[in-house]
Each structure stands twice: as C-alpha cells, then as structure tokens.
Design a protein with these regions (language model features):
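Extended, low-hydrophobicity, polar/charged segments
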Residues: 1-155
C-alpha cells in the first residue's frame, strides 16, 4: 500500500500533483526539510492519535506542537499517539510516511491552522522517502479535512 496508494489517490483526485521521491530519508521533519529543500516549518506532519475509541489524524506545520488541552477540549478526550505497532495497520502507511492521502480505510482528518502560515506545504506521501507539494487549502479539500486550532507554534 503506502506510496502506491498515495499515487493512486492523486491520479484519481488531483493528477496535476506529482508525488516526489527522494533518495534521502524524509522520515522526520528535519530530514524531510533537507530532502525536499524547504524550511522545516513547511513540512506538514501527520499525527496519528487515539481519542477515546476514535482514531484521528491531525496534520500540522513542522514547527507546531500539539496542545493536549486544546485537543481534549475539541475532541472530548485525552489524546494518545498511536503505538508504532498500530500505525501501519490502521493508516496503511509506515511511521515516517504517514499522511492524509491514500489511507487504508477512511479516518477523520483535521488540518491545524498552523498550516495556513504557508502558501505551500510538504506532507509525506506514504513512505519515508516521498512527499507532495500542495497548498494547505487544497490538501484540506482533497482529504475532506476540517480546520482546527489544536497546536501551538514553537517560537
């Protein structure tokens, strides 16, 4: 799945967007920024969380940190990161390549307002060596994401 499912997602929904593949690892914000030649804040990281019985994905700017209190208020429960052993089974993507595109099964997706500081962001594309360049609004539109304010930007 993963890279292939993301390529299929874009072929169907946005054929004008190219999936970029790097020979360098893009498994972390810092590595992705280096691999794709952008500042770390432009990397759109996808957080895989369990809140109560629900699994949700929150996409945020690379320099943003999840605010547990805001997440608890918004979603009605304490957020817990999915375990490393759960991520691929639930999302279809390996850790370091998790993104809101080409998921194994539909999940609620939320885009944090921290992304709106940028005209173009660079989320992963299903593997630890791939990404796409996309506007935050287009990403939200393609994934049917809801905009939320649940992160704080590091200064």
């Amino acid at each position: 799945m993963s890279l292939e499912s993301v390529r299929a997602f874009f072929a169907e929904k946005a054929p004008d967007i190219d999936v970029l593949v790097s020979s360098q690892s893009s498994a972390t914000v810092a590595l992705a920024a280096q691999a794709f030649g952008v500042e770390p804040a432009r990397i759109a990281k996808t957080l895989s969380l369990r809140v109560g019985e629900r699994v949700i994905l929150i996409v945020a700017a690379g320099n943003a940190r999840m605010d547990n209190k805001k997440v608890k208020t918004k979603f009605g429960g304490k957020p817990k990161m999915l375990g490393l052993d759960e991520v691929a089974g639930i999302t279809g993507h390996e850790v370091g390549g998790v993104c809101p595109f080409g998921l194994k099964s539909p999940l609620p997706i939320y885009c944090d307002v921290s992304l709106k500081a940028f005209d173009i962001v660079v989320p992963a594309a299903g593997s630890t060596h791939s990404a796409v360049k996309i506007t935050p609004d287009r990403m939200a539109e393609l994934t049917s994401a809801e905009w939320v304010d649940v992160c704080e930007v590091a200064t």
